[in-house]
């Protein structure tokens, strides 16, 4: 199924692959953005959340549930201080939810949105007046969150390493511009940003954003962005010039050291490396820690160092 938002309504296509029949829910109440963001429920495929506004006034998250051939709304109780402009949850631990409001206020929840804590002493980038702002929780480090929005009189991007308790600027290399969306590779090695002035990328270790438009991509507003890991591609949506793909290295999402692909690097991965060497098993790129196209005792030593370093933090 596919959920989508349109000015004034939310549409659900229950069988998008086989037809265009849809179910519609018209906005109730007031205070919504022109194109308010949607967020899927991390546990229930029949549920999404829309940013309010509110059905009964105020500014809330509104839960939308598919029930038969209709969409049933439920206004969640927490009152945010302004129109909600961005929502996200951690892909590592989906009980951690994040919200930004129109004036740049940031909120964090540890219980799937039941209760919220507002970041004090911080005013983040404000929202676009009808499209919203952006939150990108890390795919690798719980608590690491990158946010973006209006950057004409302040920095457009900030980063937190503690679920938003504190933020620091993360805008080196970016011009004064509006950042509409941020997404990144599964390993966090590269972040991408869709902005008013074009597409940008931040490579881990380079410590600045770079313009990746090149000579062929359109000089236009880049409204939307999604990183598609299956094809190692950052997919940008532009204003009037269609969809443009930025293809990265096919090994960009390899988590070196995670030999058994369980998203955790530990002693089990060392055991697998030993077995690969002893029994001449098939080469796996995630076990080739030093990228010399072979797996040997050096990779075991390097993997041991990685594990010891993580335990020492």
Residue ranges of predicted features:
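Cellulosome-associated attachment modules in secreted, modular CAZymes
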Residues: 250-313
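Beta-propeller blade termini and top-face loops
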Residues: 1-250
């Amino acid at each position: 199924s596919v959920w989508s938002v349109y000015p004034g309504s939310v549409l659900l296509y229950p069988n998008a692959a086989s037809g265009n029949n849809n179910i519609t829910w018209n906005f109730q109440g007031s205070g919504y953005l022109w194109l308010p963001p949607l967020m899927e429920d991390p546990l229930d495929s029949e549920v999404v959340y829309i940013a309010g506004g509110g059905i009964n006034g105020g500014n809330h998250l509104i839960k939308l549930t598919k029930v038969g051939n209709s969409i049933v709304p439920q206004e969640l109780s927490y009152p945010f201080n302004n129109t909600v402009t961005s929502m996200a949850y951690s892909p590592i631990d989906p009980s951690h939810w994040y919200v930004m409001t129109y004036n740049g206020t940031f909120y964090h929840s540890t219980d799937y949105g039941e209760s919220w804590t507002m970041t004090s002493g911080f005013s983040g980038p404000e929202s676009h007046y009808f499209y919203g702002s952006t939150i990108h929780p890390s795919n690798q480090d719980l608590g690491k969150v990158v946010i973006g929005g209006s950057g004409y009189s302040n920095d457009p991007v900030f980063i937190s390493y503690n679920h938003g308790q504190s933020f620091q600027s993360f805008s080196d290399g970016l011009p004064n511009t509006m950042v509409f969306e941020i997404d990144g590779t599964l390993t966090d090695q590269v972040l991408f940003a869709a902005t008013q002035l074009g597409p940008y990328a931040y490579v881990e270790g380079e410590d600045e954003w770079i313009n990746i438009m090149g000579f062929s991509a359109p000089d236009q507003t880049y409204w939307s962005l999604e990183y598609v890991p299956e094809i190692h591609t950052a997919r940008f949506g532009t204003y009037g010039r269609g969809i443009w793909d930025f293809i990265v290295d096919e090994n960009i999402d390899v988590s070196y050291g995670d030999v058994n692909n369980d998203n955790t690097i530990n002693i089990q991965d060392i055991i697998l490396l030993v077995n690969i060497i002893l029994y001449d098993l098939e080469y796996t790129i995630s076990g080739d820690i030093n990228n010399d196209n072979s797996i040997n005792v050096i990779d075991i030593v390097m993997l041991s160092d990685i594990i010891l370093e993580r335990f020492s933090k």
